[in-house]
Amino acid sequence: MIAVNPGGIIMDTTALLKEFCSAVERRDGKAFARLFTEDGVYHDVFYGAFEGRQKIAEMVDDWFHRTARDFRWEMFRPVSDGKTLYAYYTFSYVSTLPEAKGKRVGFDGVSIMNLRDGKIAEYREVANASLGLLEIGFAPERVAKILAKESAHLKKRPEWARHSA
C-alpha cells in the first residue's frame, strides 16, 4: 500500500509494516527503532510508553525478550491517509514465564501509527491482550490488575474526554 503524507512524501506502508514485524521477530531493536522519528513514542499494552529511539530499541531487545521468545507478528489490511496508519494484526510468542510452561500464546489487535515524514511518530494499539494473559495461566486477579491499568490509560486519552464527563 502506498500513501502520500501531507508533506508530499510517498511511503510504502506495506514495507514499513513488514519491517516493523520482522525487526521484532529477529530481535533487532536498532532496526525497529529506525522506523520511528527521533522523538517517537511506542505505547506498549503491557509495559507502558517508551520514548525516543534508544528506549524503543531497548524495549524490543530487552523488555520483549525478557519473558518470551520466538515472536510472530503479522499485519493485515492496512489503511492510511498518510498521517495515520491502521492495521489489523496477529501476534504470538513462546512465553518463558513459569505459569506458561513454554506455551505459545497470542492475541490480535489493531495497530494505530501516527506518521511524520515517512516514520512512526507514535505507536499505540487496541489489543485483545487478555486472551494471551489467560493462555499464559495468570491468576484472574493478575489479569484484572493489568486490564485495570489499561483502562485507566485509555481514559486519559483526549478522545475519551466526552465519555468521562
Regions found by a protein language model. Name each.
Residues K83-Y93:
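A short hydrophobic beta-strand element
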Residues L17-F20, V24, F36, V60, ...:
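Hydrophobic alpha-helical core bundles mediating ligand binding, dimerization, or RNAP-core interactions
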Residues A68-R69, Y93-R104:
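Short, cysteine-centered beta-strand-loop-beta hairpins and adjacent loop/turn segments enriched
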Residues M1-E38, V143-A165:
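Short, low-complexity N-terminal intrinsically disordered segments enriched in polar/charged residues
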